[in-house]
Design a protein with these regions (language model features):
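Macromolecular interaction modules
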Residues: 2-283
Length: 283
C-alpha cells in the first residue's frame, strides 16, 4: 500500500481507535429493520440488499458484530397479529426483516459511522429507492430470557446460530412508567413461563432509541422511544408449526396484564444468503 493511500484512508488512526473503549461481545444494542419492497421490485431489492447493502451498509461497519436476514412469505404474513397494527399498515407490510447486533457501549461510535457511510452510499447511487421502511430503529438491549438457563447458545450467538425462525413482537405501554412495569413483568413472569417447554430458545428484549437528526430522509423518525419494547423470539422450529399453540393468544395475555398492548406479532424464517429463495412467495 502506498503512503498516499494510507494517508488518504487514515490507516494509522485505526490502531489508536482499537486500543481504547469497550470491546466486549455482548449485544448492547441492535438495529432492527423491517422493509417492504415495492410491487414488481422484489427480486431487484433482494439482490441489492444481499449483494451490497447487507455488507457495505451494515456488516462492514465498526462495532456491528453480527447480522441475520429473515423473510415472511405470504402465508407467514397472514399469521400476523393484531389485524389493526400501529406498526405496520396493513399488518402484512414488511416482508423482510434484518437484525444486527452492535457491541455494548459502542452505540455512539457506530452511529457516527453509519450516518456517514449511508450518505456516501446514497451519493454513489448505491441505495435502492423502491422500498418502504415499515419499522426501522436502533435499539438498546434491556434483557434476554433463556429457556434452558445457562445451557445453549447465548444472545451474542443468536444471529449466527441456525435458528429455524424468528418472531418479532412490538409492545406499547401507555407511559414511560408503565413501560418499566411492563419490562419487569415480561422478564420475571411472562416470558419465563412462555418459553418453558416451547420451541423458543431465547427472547431478547430491546427499547428503541431515536435516530439522529442527520439520518437519511427515507427513514422516518422512530416512534415510541419512551413507551415501546421490541422482542425477538428465536425459534428452533418453523413458526408455522408452532404458531397456534405458542403464539395465538399472546397479545391477549399482555392486554389482560394491564401493562400494554401488542402492536405487532410477526413470524419470519431465515433467508438463504446469495439466493432468491422465497422471493416468489411474498405476494
Amino acid at each position: 500500500m502506498s503512503e498516499n493511500t494510507r494517508s488518504d484512508t487514515h490507516s494509522e488512526t485505526y490502531a489508536e481507535l482499537a486500543a481504547v473503549g469497550p470491546y466486549g461481545v455482548r449485544p448492547g444494542h441492535a438495529l432492527i429493520t423491517m422493509v417492504e419492497p415495492r410491487p414488481g421490485h422484489e427480486y431487484a431489492y433482494n439482490r441489492w440488499y444481499e449483494d451490497d447493502h447487507f455488507y457495505a451498509g451494515a456488516m462492514a461497519m465498526p462495532w456491528m458484530s453480527a447480522g441475520r436476514r429473515w423473510v415472511a412469505t405470504r402465508d407467514l404474513q397472514l399469521l400476523r397479529l393484531p389485524e389493526k397494527s400501529a406498526v405496520a399498515q396493513p399488518v402484512t407490510a414488511g416482508c423482510y426483516l434484518t437484525t444486527y447486533w452492535v457491541t455494548d457501549g459502542r452505540y455512539d461510535d457506530h452511529m457516527k459511522w453509519t450516518v456517514a457511510i449511508n450518505k456516501r452510499l446514497n451519493r454513489d447511487g448505491r441505495v435502492y429507492r423502491d422500498r418502504t421502511h415499515v419499522f426501522t430503529a436502533f435499539q438498546d438491549h434491556e434483557a434476554t430470557v433463556y429457556r434452558d438457563g445457562a445451557a445453549g447458545p447465548r444472545d451474542f450467538h443468536a444471529l449466527d446460530h441456525p435458528y429455524a425462525g424468528l418472531v418479532l413482537e412490538v409492545v406499547d405501554a401507555e407511559s414511560p412508567e408503565q413501560r418499566a412495569e411492563l419490562l419487569e413483568w415480561l422478564v420475571s413472569r411472562h416470558l419465563p413461563k412462555r418459553v418453558a417447554g416451547s420451541p423458543a430458545a431465547m427472547v431478547t428484549v430491546f427499547r428503541p432509541t431515536p435516530l439522529p437528526g442527520d439520518r437519511m430522509t427515507y427513514v422516518k423518525q422512530v416512534e415510541g422511544v419512551d413507551t415501546r419494547l421490541t422482542l425477538l423470539w428465536f425459534l428452533e422450529a418453523d413458526p408455522r408449526e408452532c404458531w397456534d399453540p405458542y403464539f395465538t393468544g399472546l397479545d391477549a395475555a399482555v392486554t389482560e396484564a394491564g401493562l400494554g398492548r401488542v402492536e405487532l406479532l410477526a413470524p419470519f424464517v431465515p433467508t438463504i444468503p446469495g439466493t432468491d429463495k422465497y422471493v416468489d412467495q411474498l405476494r
